[in-house]
From Swiss-Prot:
Gene3D superfamilies: 2.20.25.10. It comes from the Bacteria. Pfam families: Trm112p. One of its GO terms (cellular component) is cytosol. Signal peptide: none annotated. This is UPF0434 protein Shew_1640. The lineage of its organism: Bacteria, Pseudomonadati, Pseudomonadota, Gammaproteobacteria, Alteromonadales.
Length: 59
């Protein structure tokens, strides 16, 4: 199942409530402010702080 990019208009980072960006190659949503990545499983973003992974722009 593909991620619906329209969700980006309504979802926010659960930590800072900031904007998330879609990383299609890695199937995750990125919060650049908190440097966290949230996985997308079967088209559904897992927006739980304890499930986030550190994000590195170079990765």
């Amino acid at each position: 199942m593909a991620f619906d990019k329209k969700l980006l208009e309504i979802v926010a980072c659960p930590v800072c409530k900031g904007k998330l960006e879609y990383d299609k190659a890695n199937q995750q949503l990125i919060c650049k402010a908190d440097r966290l990545a949230y996985a997308i499983n079967e088209g559904i973003p897992v927006l739980l702080e304890n499930k986030a992974t550190p994000w590195n722009e170079e990765a």
